[in-house]
Regions:
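Nucleic-acid endo/exonuclease domains
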Residues: 1-85
Length: 85
């Protein structure tokens, strides 16, 4: 399956890192008809994390609870946390 990420950050045409904004549906099953669909969502999220890990691509995951905190300093801090993965 094709893995889609919310944002890709490039510098000089080189991928620097990926960003995933994770809404509430990534944490609680109430957005889904069945538990199985929720578990598929979690599997898809884990596939993205594993892809980035295997390909040494830094992945910033922003939980919906941080929505009002997002600014350039927030992103820089998150990048510093993941850049050497």
């Amino acid at each position: 399956n094709l893995l889609r990420f919310d944002f890709a950050i490039f510098e000089n045409e080189k991928l620097v890192y990926l960003i995933e904004y994770q809404g509430e549906q990534h944490y609680t099953p109430y957005h889904f008809d069945t538990q199985e669909k929720f578990e598929k969502r979690l599997e898809y999220d884990n596939a993205k994390k594993e892809y980035c890990k295997q390909n040494r691509i830094p992945l910033i995951i922003i939980p919906y609870t941080d929505f009002n905190k997002i600014d350039i300093q927030y992103l820089n801090k998150k990048y510093q946390e993941v850049k050497n993965i």
